[in-house]
Amino acid sequence: MTAALTLAAEHDLAGRHDDAINALARATQAGDLDAMTELGKRLIIGDRGPLLPKDGAGFLIDAFKGGHAEAALKLATLTALGAHVEQSWHGALALLVFAAQRGSESARGQLRALAGTAAGTDVGAGEQQWLRLAQRIDLEYWTRAPAGETLSADPLVRVYRDFVTDSVCTWLIERARPNLKRALIYDPVGGKDIADHMRTNSAAGFDLMHADLVQVAVQCRMSAAVGLSVHQMEGPTVLHYAKGEEITNHYDFVNPRIPNYDAEIKDRGQRIITFLVYLNDDYEGGETDFPSLGLRYHGGKGQGLYFTNALANGEPDLRMVHAGLPPKDKEKWLMSQFIRNRIVLGARAEVQAS
């Protein structure tokens, strides 16, 4: 960690976030690529500082041009999404290769996951192995609409039997594992998130600067399936249920009758779709249960399932109460994605998992 990053961390620890931003800015002006990258990341999502995404993206671009691997890694995510930079999947993969060639283990792992190739499997050695891995990635797979099956027409519930690959499932699990925290629910009385007996599982959330290209690829496949933009998606969350853990009956829509939620709907829109990706299936129980529909679904590894949370007019659909039943013997993993009815990408984000 450079002196500027250490100083910024000390300021943040003391609650002096403006001083932290200023320390990073001074070091950036002096050409410190680590500080430049950190400043860019913070400005893009308004992390303990101003929300200046265009400026933040500019700092990442400058750091990348200086040869900084992490800057390239973050730019890869932005480029795949078309967030604050021009959208290009080929450009995103080129940035990932750049980071991998400069030693980024995260970039190397993402390339392996997307290519479906185990480490060291017939791609040779040296810097060119990462380019060869990138060339194996089937971009059409991630950007075309997969074949699906309707489980319920009204309200709509659809399943995709071949939604993501095993290597992507493994990556998503291992990426989330060290970042898991007790999952919370919103308490409308206290106006804050709290732990509650109705939800006993763990979760790891990823904002724009902590998401990676594998997660974005999954989001793009979701986008093709539902016909809505990735820019309408909140940050992805990976959920973990140990044996006996659950979330009881609940709704995913934003309830306009809860104080302050009507303002959120006006600002960010309604959560109209929930998309789940099942990352393992070696457990008993653990179904996704829709009691009002008489439907329970035990997802297979790599399968996707989405359901609507709102009526055509945007009002909450009370039929869509659902639960994550407890696994009876082993753990359960899945990726959860909320999709809104308006653009939310680029909004100020809370600091989430690293």
Question: Model-flagged regions — what are they?
Answer:
Residues M1-A3:
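TPR-adjacent "capping" and linker segments in tetratricopeptide-repeat scaffold/adaptor proteins
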Residues T6-G15, A20, R26, K41-R42, ...:
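Fe(II)/2-oxoglutarate oxygenase catalytic core
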Residues A30-L33, I45-D47, K65-A69, L81-A83, ...:
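Short helix-capping/linker turns of helical repeat alpha-solenoids
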